[in-house]
Amino acid sequence: MWQSFAEYISSLCEKNPTKICEIGVGKFTQVFDYLNKQDNVEIIKTDISPNDSSVIKDDVTKPDLKLYKNLDIIYSIRPPSELQPHIIDLALKANTKLIIKPLFNEDINSKNVKLTLKNYNKASFYTLGV
């Protein structure tokens, strides 16, 4: 499933470089690692509690908008339901594509914003602006 999710994001990388941010990276880095190996990708990762120096500290409920300027894609893997509206708001403010992979069988907390459910190979997730 994670390979399919990473491949889908990679398929959206039309620009060289495509600028991507993973929000709320936590300890799971499989998708980040895959994307980081792509020649046409510049990627950063943010989290409120960074695990190491490669993660930029940022609170998505009060984001530093400068971090997200000129991004092409924001994605988040299993963000808590209460953070999902903040991630959506951030993507709208940054005028970027958004991909959210919620927990299995979890409904997305999008408030009044319509996201599209996407099935790609073995992965299911929600998109905005894609």
Where are these regions (language model features)?
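S-adenosyl-L-methionine
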Residues: 1-16
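Residues in the short beta-alpha loop(s) of Rossmann-like NAD(P)-binding domains
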Residues: 26, 47-49, 104
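Conserved SAM-binding loop of SAM-dependent methyltransferases across substrates and taxa
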Residues: 27-38
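Conserved S-adenosyl-L-methionine
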Residues: 36-42, 93-95
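A short acidic, Gly/Pro-enriched loop at the edge of an enzyme's catalytic core
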Residues: 65-73
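C-terminal substrate-binding/active-site "lid" region of AdoMet-derived donor-dependent transferases
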Residues: 81-130
